[in-house]
Design a protein with these regions (language model features):
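N-terminal Rossmann-like NAD(P)+-binding subdomain of aldehyde/semialdehyde dehydrogenases
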Residues: 1-131
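Rossmann-like NAD(P) dinucleotide-binding subdomain of oxidoreductase/dehydrogenase enzymes
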Residues: 121-220
Protein backbone atom coordinates (compact mmCIF):
# COMPACT_ATOMS: atom_id res chain seq x y z
CA UNK A 1 0.00 0.00 0.00
CA UNK A 2 1.31 3.47 -0.85
CA UNK A 3 0.57 6.60 1.17
CA UNK A 4 1.26 9.91 -0.51
CA UNK A 5 2.56 12.71 1.70
CA UNK A 6 1.89 16.21 0.43
CA UNK A 7 3.03 18.47 3.25
CA UNK A 8 6.10 19.54 5.14
CA UNK A 9 4.37 21.85 7.57
CA UNK A 10 0.91 21.74 8.99
CA UNK A 11 -0.17 24.42 6.49
CA UNK A 12 -0.03 22.14 3.41
CA UNK A 13 3.18 23.67 2.09
CA UNK A 14 4.56 21.62 -0.79
CA UNK A 15 8.17 21.39 -1.96
CA UNK A 16 9.34 23.90 -4.55
CA UNK A 17 8.73 21.64 -7.52
CA UNK A 18 7.21 18.25 -8.28
CA UNK A 19 9.86 16.31 -6.38
CA UNK A 20 9.00 13.18 -4.48
CA UNK A 21 10.67 9.91 -3.56
CA UNK A 22 9.32 6.46 -2.84
CA UNK A 23 10.02 4.42 0.25
CA UNK A 24 9.70 0.69 -0.38
CA UNK A 25 8.60 -1.96 2.08
CA UNK A 26 11.83 -3.77 3.02
CA UNK A 27 10.00 -7.10 3.20
CA UNK A 28 7.95 -7.02 0.00
CA UNK A 29 9.65 -4.43 -2.17
CA UNK A 30 6.33 -2.68 -2.78
CA UNK A 31 6.04 1.10 -2.51
CA UNK A 32 5.14 1.88 1.10
CA UNK A 33 4.92 5.67 0.83
CA UNK A 34 5.65 8.58 -1.47
CA UNK A 35 7.07 11.69 0.21
CA UNK A 36 8.30 15.16 -0.75
CA UNK A 37 12.01 15.39 -1.57
CA UNK A 38 12.72 18.73 0.05
CA UNK A 39 15.93 20.60 -0.65
CA UNK A 40 17.89 23.35 1.07
CA UNK A 41 15.54 26.08 -0.17
CA UNK A 42 12.54 24.22 1.24
CA UNK A 43 14.37 23.77 4.54
CA UNK A 44 14.96 27.51 4.78
CA UNK A 45 11.31 28.20 4.01
CA UNK A 46 10.02 25.95 6.76
CA UNK A 47 12.58 27.35 9.21
CA UNK A 48 11.31 30.84 8.43
CA UNK A 49 7.75 29.68 9.15
CA UNK A 50 8.85 28.18 12.47
CA UNK A 51 10.72 31.37 13.39
CA UNK A 52 7.67 33.49 12.58
CA UNK A 53 5.54 31.33 14.88
CA UNK A 54 8.02 31.47 17.77
CA UNK A 55 7.04 34.80 19.40
CA UNK A 56 3.41 33.84 19.77
CA UNK A 57 4.09 30.29 20.93
CA UNK A 58 6.79 31.26 23.43
CA UNK A 59 4.45 33.86 24.95
CA UNK A 60 1.72 31.28 25.54
CA UNK A 61 1.30 30.29 29.17
CA UNK A 62 2.20 26.87 30.56
CA UNK A 63 -1.37 25.69 31.07
CA UNK A 64 -2.47 26.30 27.45
CA UNK A 65 0.69 24.54 26.25
CA UNK A 66 -0.07 21.60 28.52
CA UNK A 67 -3.64 21.40 27.24
CA UNK A 68 -2.46 21.25 23.64
CA UNK A 69 0.12 18.58 24.41
CA UNK A 70 -2.52 16.46 26.11
CA UNK A 71 -4.73 16.86 23.04
CA UNK A 72 -1.79 15.83 20.86
CA UNK A 73 -1.32 12.65 22.90
CA UNK A 74 -4.98 11.79 22.34
CA UNK A 75 -4.65 12.58 18.63
CA UNK A 76 -1.69 10.21 18.36
CA UNK A 77 -3.74 7.43 19.95
CA UNK A 78 -6.71 8.16 17.69
CA UNK A 79 -4.47 7.53 14.66
CA UNK A 80 -3.25 4.18 15.96
CA UNK A 81 -4.19 2.17 12.89
CA UNK A 82 -2.57 4.66 10.51
CA UNK A 83 0.63 4.70 12.57
CA UNK A 84 0.82 0.92 12.78
CA UNK A 85 0.22 0.49 9.06
CA UNK A 86 2.77 3.13 8.10
CA UNK A 87 5.47 1.88 10.46
CA UNK A 88 5.04 -1.75 9.43
CA UNK A 89 5.08 -0.90 5.72
CA UNK A 90 8.02 1.49 5.86
CA UNK A 91 10.32 -0.25 8.34
CA UNK A 92 9.20 -3.88 8.24
CA UNK A 93 8.43 -3.86 11.95
CA UNK A 94 6.03 -6.16 13.72
CA UNK A 95 2.60 -4.93 14.73
CA UNK A 96 3.46 -5.34 18.40
CA UNK A 97 6.54 -3.14 18.13
CA UNK A 98 4.57 -0.47 16.27
CA UNK A 99 1.80 -0.43 18.89
CA UNK A 100 4.36 -0.26 21.70
CA UNK A 101 5.96 2.72 19.94
CA UNK A 102 2.63 4.51 19.83
CA UNK A 103 1.72 3.74 23.44
CA UNK A 104 5.06 4.96 24.78
CA UNK A 105 5.08 8.03 22.53
CA UNK A 106 1.64 9.16 23.70
CA UNK A 107 2.80 8.81 27.29
CA UNK A 108 5.90 10.87 26.53
CA UNK A 109 3.76 13.70 25.16
CA UNK A 110 1.66 13.70 28.34
CA UNK A 111 4.83 13.75 30.45
CA UNK A 112 6.05 16.72 28.41
CA UNK A 113 2.75 18.43 29.09
CA UNK A 114 3.27 17.96 32.81
CA UNK A 115 6.65 19.68 32.54
CA UNK A 116 5.18 22.98 31.39
CA UNK A 117 4.48 24.09 34.97
CA UNK A 118 7.79 22.73 36.31
CA UNK A 119 10.13 25.00 34.35
CA UNK A 120 11.69 27.18 37.04
CA UNK A 121 14.70 29.36 37.68
CA UNK A 122 16.96 29.79 40.66
CA UNK A 123 18.25 32.43 43.00
CA UNK A 124 21.98 33.06 42.60
CA UNK A 125 24.11 34.27 45.54
CA UNK A 126 25.23 37.87 45.07
CA UNK A 127 28.18 39.76 46.54
CA UNK A 128 26.20 42.99 46.42
CA UNK A 129 24.24 43.63 49.63
CA UNK A 130 20.50 43.86 49.12
CA UNK A 131 20.74 42.57 45.55
CA UNK A 132 18.57 39.66 44.46
CA UNK A 133 20.10 37.78 41.50
CA UNK A 134 18.01 35.26 39.61
CA UNK A 135 18.52 32.94 36.66
CA UNK A 136 15.47 32.35 34.47
CA UNK A 137 14.93 29.69 31.84
CA UNK A 138 13.52 30.95 28.56
CA UNK A 139 12.66 29.35 25.19
CA UNK A 140 15.55 29.61 22.73
CA UNK A 141 13.75 29.62 19.36
CA UNK A 142 13.44 27.03 16.61
CA UNK A 143 14.57 23.51 17.52
CA UNK A 144 15.59 20.95 14.88
CA UNK A 145 14.91 17.34 15.87
CA UNK A 146 16.52 14.63 13.73
CA UNK A 147 14.76 11.32 14.31
CA UNK A 148 15.96 7.87 13.19
CA UNK A 149 13.88 5.00 11.87
CA UNK A 150 14.40 2.15 14.33
CA UNK A 151 11.82 3.34 16.87
CA UNK A 152 10.27 6.04 14.71
CA UNK A 153 7.23 7.06 16.71
CA UNK A 154 9.03 7.09 20.05
CA UNK A 155 12.10 8.90 18.75
CA UNK A 156 10.14 11.26 16.54
CA UNK A 157 8.02 12.36 19.50
CA UNK A 158 11.05 12.56 21.77
CA UNK A 159 12.66 14.99 19.32
CA UNK A 160 9.86 17.55 19.63
CA UNK A 161 7.72 17.07 22.75
CA UNK A 162 9.91 18.64 25.45
CA UNK A 163 11.08 21.54 23.24
CA UNK A 164 7.41 22.34 22.60
CA UNK A 165 6.63 22.15 26.31
CA UNK A 166 9.41 24.67 26.95
CA UNK A 167 7.96 27.17 24.46
CA UNK A 168 10.09 26.47 21.40
CA UNK A 169 8.86 25.86 17.87
CA UNK A 170 10.13 22.70 16.20
CA UNK A 171 11.11 21.13 12.90
CA UNK A 172 11.10 17.35 12.75
CA UNK A 173 13.61 16.07 10.20
CA UNK A 174 11.92 12.86 9.07
CA UNK A 175 13.98 9.79 8.34
CA UNK A 176 14.03 8.95 4.65
CA UNK A 177 13.35 5.37 5.79
CA UNK A 178 9.98 6.24 7.36
CA UNK A 179 8.75 9.63 6.11
CA UNK A 180 5.06 8.73 6.39
CA UNK A 181 5.39 7.57 9.98
CA UNK A 182 7.13 10.77 11.01
CA UNK A 183 4.73 12.98 9.07
CA UNK A 184 1.82 11.38 10.90
CA UNK A 185 3.25 12.73 14.15
CA UNK A 186 3.07 16.29 12.86
CA UNK A 187 -0.42 15.69 11.47
CA UNK A 188 -1.56 14.57 14.93
CA UNK A 189 -0.14 17.72 16.54
CA UNK A 190 -1.85 19.86 13.90
CA UNK A 191 -5.14 18.07 14.55
CA UNK A 192 -4.71 18.83 18.26
CA UNK A 193 -4.77 22.54 17.48
CA UNK A 194 -1.14 23.64 17.57
CA UNK A 195 -0.81 27.08 15.96
CA UNK A 196 0.43 27.48 12.42
CA UNK A 197 4.18 27.02 12.06
CA UNK A 198 4.78 25.68 15.57
CA UNK A 199 5.23 22.01 14.57
CA UNK A 200 6.82 21.27 11.20
CA UNK A 201 8.31 18.34 9.30
CA UNK A 202 10.84 18.16 6.48
CA UNK A 203 11.61 15.05 4.44
CA UNK A 204 14.29 14.45 1.85
CA UNK A 205 15.19 11.79 -0.67
CA UNK A 206 18.01 9.41 0.35
CA UNK A 207 20.30 11.12 -2.17
CA UNK A 208 19.82 14.56 -0.55
CA UNK A 209 20.10 14.14 3.23
CA UNK A 210 23.36 16.04 3.67
CA UNK A 211 22.30 19.13 1.71
CA UNK A 212 18.92 19.43 3.40
CA UNK A 213 20.08 18.70 6.94
CA UNK A 214 23.20 20.86 6.74
CA UNK A 215 21.11 23.73 5.40
CA UNK A 216 18.87 23.58 8.47
CA UNK A 217 21.79 23.26 10.90
CA UNK A 218 23.52 26.32 9.42
CA UNK A 219 20.49 28.58 9.68
CA UNK A 220 20.83 31.36 12.31
Amino acid sequence: MSDSIDTFTRQDMAPSGPRTFDRRNPLTGEVASSAPAHDAADAREVADAAAAAFPGWSALGPNPRRALLNKAAAALEARANAFVEAMMNETGSTEGWARFNLMLAAGMVREAGALTTQIGGEVIPSDKPGCLAMALREPVGVILGIAPWNAPIILGVRAIAVPLACGNTVILKASETCPRTHSLIVEAFAEAGFPEGVVNVVSNAPRLPVNTTVAMCLLP
